[in-house]
Amino acid sequence: MKTLGKVSDFVGKYMAAIVIVVAAGALFFPGPFSVVKTAWVNNLLGIVMFGMGLTLKPEDFKVVFSRPKDVIVGCVAQFTLMPFLAWALTQVFHLPTELAIGVILVGTCPGGTSSNVMTYLSKGDVALSVGMTAVSTVLAPLLTPLLTLLYAGQRVDVNPMSMFMSIVKVVLVPIALGFVVNHFFHKFTEEAVRVLPLVSTTAIVLIICAVVSANSAKIMTSGLLILVVVILHNVLGYLTGFGVGKLLKLDSTKCRAISIEVGMQNSGLATSLAAAHFAQYPLATIPGAVFSVWHNISGAILANFFARTAEKKD
């Protein structure tokens, strides 16, 4: 377990670099990577969500009751800013339908699991970040389908009930199972959690392999446009999230947490939903995969910037 723990620490530390290398390999040499099928995406995401559940404790939800205003502000920002920004970018760049669906799905999904780590590295309010991730994830089965219907319903048929069931099965059930296992077998999970970065990164890398290798030719023709839109969506999320915190006169640690939480999305879920519910639009899976690569890079850069500014103030 010690060796595995060291490997896991290494993988967690260099996750962004690993994801970039694998994504580039799947893009330029799709053949070897195509052994990973897009049909695996839901199961792989379930593994990531189960891992998230293993790290959750009842105390993580205390912030919801002890500081409801902070959590509400963060979650409202999450589910208003990112969906609107996604839709606005699809209009500004006149994205074709299949790319637009993918971008909108990224915007309507809850906060990403790695946002908590980035908040910690940024010297932000980790309790708030964990609380926001937990609450936005619980709200996702209801809000993600409805927001997708609102912003993408004019372009394509959206089945909110079917999406609701998918999110419950792929996200809530694995998280709940992980939470229960952690509660009843805490001594075991305390050891197992050490290898979670390895397991989660492997699952995310395999999702990216599946999506990028299956669509490499199409990415080559429209990849730059997707990348520009994804970067703008992510960066605008960081900026507007931070701006909301400042506007409401929250302290800097809370502003950092909200900024990162709003900007970083559960893009694996966006990819999963695109593959399951919009299979007739293969490119809809691409924005989620590109976001998965990019937000780990931008999140690390932003966390480093926030940490340095916090040190200067101290």
Functional labels for PLM-detected ranges:
Residues 1-314:
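Alpha-helical transmembrane segments of multi-pass small-molecule/ion transporters
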